[in-house]
């Protein structure tokens, strides 16, 4: 489905659609006759009323209008073909109106709602307006300004997303076949590389109905999907390159590579990715820490050999202290282990090896993370602080939104994360980054690594911004990147399961957004999702529902 401007030659057909939609709610012919003049669309007014339609390959499915001049406007029409009601068309059109209104500088919209439509608008954040004349419920929508970071990220526009996870990782060492396969699944998160994609370029096929399901939840318009393509693959297809560049939209890669720089025309200078190294980032942390009383940097050692590392680990184990063993590069906890006893040298990873003081997270949350970005001019923008879910050393997901991280802890992370961003900007880095922490004794934050790319928490921040803008309120969003399934599900059954889950979550006033839909038929099947709600209780209930339903598949298909 896509949205376009209405054409003069379809004014009569759109009027007929509006009247059919109105009649759907049980109004008789006599009543509709009294409404006809008000609901008639004339060819001459299409532009002035900013009338647009939603259509698929076969028919126009809905129509809406944004009327008036900034700062105060009116949502004049929003009608959906009766056979398409309940399919997310109205929500997508409503989101389009809000997007357009923000772009044009509107601050408020009023809606004279049909009584039957009032619950729809109320669920999307509209509230009763001050009493006014007229027989219809009058609602009002306050359009909050777009977040500073979102404006800096894509100029507030849609974007072309490149899921180049394995390519990015391959810049720092060999990517095994197993890791490449996992990265292919994880690359689905590139759908959330900005709040509203126009096109996705992904390294593996995704279920055909997945993007439509996500679009329905987030009010996206039509999204072009190009599968089984890496950045270098795209560059070998001149027609595709011309098309993507011809969209005139920002390119957003998962991480910067030579290929993504060539596609976007915005490459990075040599050395701009240096702080992706855990050794280099630790050096930076120690340099910055004296100006940040809330930060305590763990000790780090760089043994020359695995044998030397084993001796140091054993000595620390004898004194009752654990040691973190890190590879210099690695994502999501890969290449990182916590050892509480001695280890044989041959069991340790090859290559550059780092040993680090183990900090047992004893705060709430135990693993916060700061997300920010450096814009094209080198200015740093805070995105926020998330509470990560980390099992042992493996990243599982993150929660963003009100109350996810206590204010004092968040303030320390924001200040330090901002300082890191300024150092990144000085190296020539431009783009998204995060700083991961462990909450140590006394609530002091121990920084552990920098990621110079998009991350799991970034997907939660993008979804939160989109939900807040299109549904109102201040959402909590939780990313669950690996929810085990009780049975392997082929694509058709997986989409049916996810569709049912979205409806069940809606029934408890929560939102479910499938984020990783490609691993349902793996030997150890799983799915990734984002869940959202306006309260912590509903968010927890939604997660519990998703996990229980996923486990229960064993009884249905096992």
Listing of model-derived features with the role each one plays in the protein:
Residues 101-114:
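Conserved GNAT acetyl-CoA-binding A-motif
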Residues 86-99:
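Conserved acetyl-CoA-binding loop-helix of GNAT-fold acetyltransferases
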Residues 295-298, 320-325, 338-364, 556:
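Conserved ATP-binding module of the ATP-grasp superfamily
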Residues 361, 369-421, 451-479:
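ATP-dependent carboxylate/phosphate-activation module, predominantly the ATP-grasp catalytic core
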Residues 395-442, 486-507:
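A long amphipathic alpha-helix within ATP-dependent nucleotide-binding catalytic cores
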Residues 5-77, 81-83, 94-95:
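Acetyl-CoA-dependent GNAT
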Residues 179-193, 200-311:
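Conserved N-proximal alpha/beta basic substrate-recognition cap immediately N-terminal to
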Residues 468-558:
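Peripheral (often C-terminal) accessory segments that flank ATP-dependent C-N-forming ligase machineries
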């Amino acid at each position: 489905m896509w949205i376009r401007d209405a054409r003069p030659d379809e004014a009569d057909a759109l009027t007929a659609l509006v009247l059919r939609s109105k009649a759907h709610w049980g109004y008789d012919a006599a009543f509709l006759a009294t409404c006809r003049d008000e609901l008639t669309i004339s060819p001459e007014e299409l532009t002035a009323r900013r009338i647009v339609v939603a259509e698929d390959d076969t028919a126009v499915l809905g129509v809406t209008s944004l009327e008036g001049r900034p700062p105060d406007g009116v949502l004049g029409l929003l009608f959906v073909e009766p056979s398409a009601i309940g399919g997310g068309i109205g929500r997508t059109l409503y989101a389009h109106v809000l997007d357009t209104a923000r772009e044009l500088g509107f601050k408020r919209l009023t809606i004279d709602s049909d009584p039957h439509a009032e619950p729809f608008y109320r669920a999307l954040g509209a509230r009763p307006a001050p009493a006014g004349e007229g027989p219809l419920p009058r609602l009002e929508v306050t359009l909050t300004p777009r977040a500073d970071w979102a404006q800096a990220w894509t100029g507030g526009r849609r974007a072309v997303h490149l899921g180049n996870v394995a390519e990015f990782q391959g810049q720092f060492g060999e990517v095994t076949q197993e890791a490449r396969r996992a990265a292919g699944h994880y690359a689905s998160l590139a759908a959330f590389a900005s709040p509203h994609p126009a096109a996705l370029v992904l390294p593996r096929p995704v279920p055909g109905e997945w993007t439509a399901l996500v679009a329905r939840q987030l009010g996206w318009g039509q999204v072009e999907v190009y599968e089984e393509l890496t950045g270098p693959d795209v560059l070998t297809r001149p027609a595709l390159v011309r098309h993507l560049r011809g969209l005139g939209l920002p390119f957003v890669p998962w991480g910067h590579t030579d290929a993504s720089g060539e596609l976007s025309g915005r490459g990075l200078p040599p050395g701009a990715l240096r702080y992706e190294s855990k050794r280099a980032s630790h050096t930076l942390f120690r340099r910055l820490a004296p100006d940040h009383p809330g930060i305590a940097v763990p000790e780090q050692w760089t043994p020359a050999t695995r044998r030397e590392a084993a001796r140091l680990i054993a000595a620390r184990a004898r004194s009752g202290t654990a040691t973190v063993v890190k590879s210099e590069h690695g994502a999501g906890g890969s290449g990182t282990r916590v050892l509480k006893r001695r280890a044989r040298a041959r069991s340790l990873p090859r290559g550059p090896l780092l040993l680090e003081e183990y900090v047992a997270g004893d705060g709430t949350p135990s693993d916060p993370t700061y997300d920010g970005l450096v814009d094209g001019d080198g200015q740093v923008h805070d995105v926020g602080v998330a509470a990560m879910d980390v099992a042992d050393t493996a990243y599982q997901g993150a929660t963003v939104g009100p109350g996810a991280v206590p204010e004092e802890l968040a303030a320390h992370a924001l200040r330090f994360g901002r300082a890191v961003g300024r150092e990144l900007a000085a190296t020539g880095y431009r783009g998204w980054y995060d700083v991961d922490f462990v909450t140590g004794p006394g609530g002091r934050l121990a920084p552990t690594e920098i990621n110079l790319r998009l991350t799991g928490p970034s997907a939660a921040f993008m979804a939160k911004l989109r939900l807040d803008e299109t549904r109102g309120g201040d959402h909590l969003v939780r990313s669950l990147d690996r929810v085990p399934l009780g049975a392997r599900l082929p694509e058709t059954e997986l989409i049916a399961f996810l569709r049912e889950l979205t409806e069940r979550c809606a029934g408890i006033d929560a939102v479910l957004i499938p984020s990783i839909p490609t691993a349902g038929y793996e030997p150890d099947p799983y799915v990734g999702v984002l869940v959202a709600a306006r309260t912590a209780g509903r968010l927890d209930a939604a997660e519990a529902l998703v996990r229980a339903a996923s486990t229960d598949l064993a009884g249905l298909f096992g």
